[in-house]
Each structure stands twice: as structure tokens, then as C-alpha cells.
Amino acid sequence: MILPSEKSATDVAAQCFLNALIRETKDWQLAEYPPDELIIPLDEQKSLHFRVAYFSPTQHHRFAFPAHLVTASGSYPVDFTTLSRLIIDKLRHQLFLPVPLCETFHQRVLESYAHTQQTIDARHDWAILREKALNFGEAEQALLTGHAFHPAPKSHEPFNRQEAERYLPDMAPHFPLRWFSVDKTQIAGESLHLNLQQRLTRFAAENAPQLLNELSDNQWLFPLHPWQGEYLL
């Protein structure tokens, strides 16, 4: 889609996609003259231009969006759906990739992009997350954009929209674990300092003490994420 406005803005989801591409490929260049731009050629007649806000020695580059599609007839601002489609189509032709594979990949990229924006819109506290020390759970819930070098860091397949809002850490949900009574012969694992039975018993005592009477030497309490529990049942 060609955009009617050229208002410059930060787009962290698009930035993750672009930084992953820059890290994994070499078919791009920096403009030799101001303004500072990253140029990705599409073919002999078209290229994508990205205004560089900061080019990082650690590859955490920042860009001002929208990107521009430059052709023989002019320069046009384009949205993320269009620029990601153009880049994926280019790679498909270059690498002879199957069309269905590329379509699935593009769909995941767009879902991740949309989810990132939904998360930021829903988390009204995101602007103050760096103003205080966070515990482990809070830190996990503060990862609103995901991996900085990933084309689809917030893809959440196979969750649907309702499940994503209920369970994904970036939505800051709270929910209880599902507990199962499992024969010890069906459980295998290791634990530091404690044996597996001791570790599971301690975890149950800390999180579901009301279930401790279900324990026996042969039946152990085993916790699962509620989505995993529903899936197995």
C-alpha cells in the first residue's frame, strides 16, 4: 500500500524485521550522501529506501518510517505490509523458494507485526517499565517487542487471539497452573541439589498446597501450563 502521509515515526516491529534481514543478508547498502539511508535493491528499476536514525555497531539499528519505494517515476512511502511483501518476493525469486512457504512466512510476519502493536496499545504501563527493578515474571512480561533480530518475534502460533490475550506474557496475564497426578514411572528428569521427586514436591507445596494430600510414593503432582493441559486432554 502506498501511504498518503510521510510523517516520520519509530516502528519497533518493522525495525526487528529489518535488522534481522540486514544481519542475515548482504544485499543492501548505505547511501554515500545525506540523508543517511539504507537501500535495499529489489530489481534493476526499484529499491526500498529507509531513513537511518542510528546505525549501530552492535546491529541494533534504528530507522524512521515509513520506508520509500523508489522507482523510475518517483519515490513513494509504503506501509509494512507492502515493504515486507516486496522483500519476501525478492528472496523467493533469488533463492527459488516455494510459494506456499513464503506465503506462510509472510502471514506470520504480519501477525507478529500486528500483535506487537496490540500489545503496546494494551499495556498502558509500558512507558514506565524501565523506571523500577523488575522480578523475573515482570521482566518476562516486559518483553513487548521480542527478539531484536527476528522477522516475526511475536508470532504466537498456534494460539488464537483469545488464547494469546489470556496466556502470552507480554499481555501481563495471571492464571493458575494445571496439576496432574502422574505415575512416577511416566516422569523423567533431573534437578540441581534435589532429586526430581523432592523438587516437584517443593514446587507443589509452594504453589498448590491444597493438593499435597494427592501425593504418594508412586503418584507425583506434575504442573502444566493450562493451555498444555487442555491440549493433552
What are these regions (language model features)?
Residues 1-233:
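Nucleotide/phosphate-binding site architecture used for ATP/NTP-dependent chemistry
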